Design a protein with these regions (language model features):
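Sec-dependent signal peptide recognition
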Residues: 2-9
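Sec/Tat signal peptide C-region and signal peptidase I cleavage site
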Residues: 14-19
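Early exported N-terminus immediately downstream of N-terminal targeting peptides
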Residues: 21-99
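Juxtamembrane/interface motifs at transmembrane-helix termini
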Residues: 65-71, 101-107, 170-172
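A mature extracytoplasmic/lumenal domain signature
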Residues: 88, 114, 128-130, 141-143, ...
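Surface-exposed, charged secondary-structure patches
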Residues: 94-135, 187-193
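Short beta-strand edge/turn micro-motifs at domain boundaries
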Residues: 136-162
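Low-complexity, intrinsically disordered terminal/linker segments enriched in charged
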Residues: 152-193
Length: 193
């Protein structure tokens, strides 16, 4: 057991070092997204590509967990957690694909990542300019295997995870988790193309 612990302690830093830089993970994805958004209109295939790009960079399982009150999430069995995360992902992806204008930029500058927890968590700040107006985005990221994935996006000081958590907490004051899940499914269906 001590040998296994020692091997993990020795090799873990190397595994983290070989993972792509979190800024690279975000900027590569963003460049692909901007190429799509330069088109006058997006085909259904292009919109599916946008949804795929979101899935490539977002850890929807962690975002789903952080979007529910802790006691609610901890009270769910694994099947319910998986179902909620799946429907939540579908809702966010479909909603994002319908509001593509908010992702357009003329230029983007990324700050160096702020690393945390033995280089397994990072905050990446991006300054985006579109039509002369600047927005500041902070990607809260974690290392999943050897891939950097965002679990929260803070846009001009507004946290996506916190916003969903506040909405879902309000709903859960008067409705059951099953009813919340139906609301999420309905929203996902409404925004499906």
């Amino acid at each position: 057991m001590k040998i296994q612990t020692l091997l993990v302690a020795v090799f873990l830093p190397f595994a983290v070092a070989f993972a792509a830089d979190p800024v690279t993970a975000i900027s590569k994805n963003d460049k692909e997204l901007q190429v799509l958004l330069k088109k006058q209109s997006l085909s259904k295939k292009d919109k599916e590509k946008v949804k795929g790009l979101l899935s490539d960079v977002f850890n929807f399982n962690l975002l789903a967990e952080k979007s529910l009150p802790k006691e609610t999430w901890n009270g769910l069995d694994e099947a319910a957690k998986k179902q909620f995360a799946s429907e939540f992902q579908r809702m966010v992806r479909n909603s994002s694909a319908k509001r593509l204008e908010m992702y357009r930029t003329d230029s983007t500058v990324y700050e160096a990542p702020k690393m945390k927890k033995n280089n397994t968590e990072a905050n990446v700040t991006a300054h985006l300019w579109y039509r002369g107006k600047e927005s500041v985005l902070v990607y809260k990221m974690n290392l999943v295997g050897d891939v950097w994935m965002a679990w929260d996006l803070v846009i001009d000081d507004l946290s996506t995870a916190r916003n969903y958590k506040e909405q879902f907490s309000t709903i859960l004051k008067t409705k059951t988790f099953a009813e919340l899940l139906e609301i999420v499914k309905k929203k996902a269906d409404e925004n499906e193309e």
